[in-house]
Amino acid sequence: MDIKDFRHHLHCHPELSFEEHQTAAFISERLSEMGVEHCPIAGTGILARIEGRRGNLERCVVLRADIDALPIKEMTGVDYASQSEGVMHACGHDCHAAMLYGVVKRLQMERDFEGTVLALFQPGEEQFPGGASLVLKENPFDKYKVAAVIGQHVDADMEVGEIGFCPGKFMASVDDLHFKIKGIGGYANVRSKVKDAVVAAADLILRLNMLNSDVCVVSVGNVEAKGTTNVIPERVTCDGTMRAFSEKLRQRVKDMITNIVEEIEYKHDVEVQLDVREGYPCVENDMQLTYEAMLLSDSLGYQTKDLEMRTTAEDFGYYTQLYPSLFYRLGVGRNVGRAHTATFLPDDKALEIGEEFMYRLALSILNK
């Protein structure tokens, strides 16, 4: 099976985060056909191992592709469109898995390298706590000297043939924020007997908005206050997100939010319950590894692009906290729709480029 057919099969049969049972079975079957040693990991993931013929097997490169889909009804109209109602590969994870499959296929056939390659088909990137965190809880890399963890992501802001890199800090951490504000409700015309949770919520949102900067984002996207035109509700809930570009800043912003909550309670004489649901850490690329990958991209004739830090988040950040890591972006065309929408359809022509670059990068790391 070639990588295009592999991608089309996954695209046709998408599965949500941590429900990738048929996806994992399909990947396992293809690996077994090639004689590639592999095992389940993190519930619905697959970890494959290919050993080089040159020895030094404890030295290792981990190649990672996520495999989960999104709860979106597909509207692309292609003949390999999703057959799973309301579920779609709208973030390119079908492409990621197909390219990694192609790399594994080539490595298994040739095996002319030093060390070991671990190919990780990872579940659950799209949903907290993130499949990466579950993978690491199983300690699958502990017996190896991990030289690098490599991941790539399709990018509709770049053309096919372009590969984008950002040395150092690349993607933000993400945490969900949930506020419950309790006051005393009552008639809107009797203000003296009311402790207004709506006003407190408005003040809270304005104060949170003041935390925004180039390195930190705090946003509230949902507010629920079940009052009426003349009735002030007792409770208001607010839900939002917090993103930061370092773990130190992440903790500092959490502390600042806690202080704001206390000030709102005192100022408005209400109770505010804050629940922070921790998400993914920052993605921070290894500097040397990134520069070497950029040189390789140039040498292979690709258009190497410099990327800026972005406030999107990725559970790949868990790997970057522990190992030298690189997460880069692969151009798939600018006219393919936007990620996380019903019409997103990366160009198949990008698959061979993504496979080739990841393959060459793995070999360059292991054989140097």
List where the protein language model places each region:
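Non-cysteine beta-strand/loop elements that form the S-adenosyl-L-methionine
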Residues: 62-64, 73, 177, 327-333
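Short, small-residue-enriched loops and turns at beta-alpha junctions
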Residues: 13-18, 69-71, 127, 226-229, ...
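Acidic/His- and Gly-rich active-site-bordering loop/insert found
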Residues: 1-89, 98-101, 105-113
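Histidine/acidic-residue-rich, glycine-tolerant segments that coordinate divalent metal ions
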Residues: 70-72, 77-88, 94-95, 107, ...
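Metal-dependent amide/peptide-bond hydrolase catalytic core
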Residues: 199-368
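N-terminal hydrophobic/helix-forming segments and targeting peptides
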Residues: 1-14, 25, 35, 109, ...
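Divalent metal-coordination and catalytic microenvironments
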Residues: 10, 63, 93, 119, ...
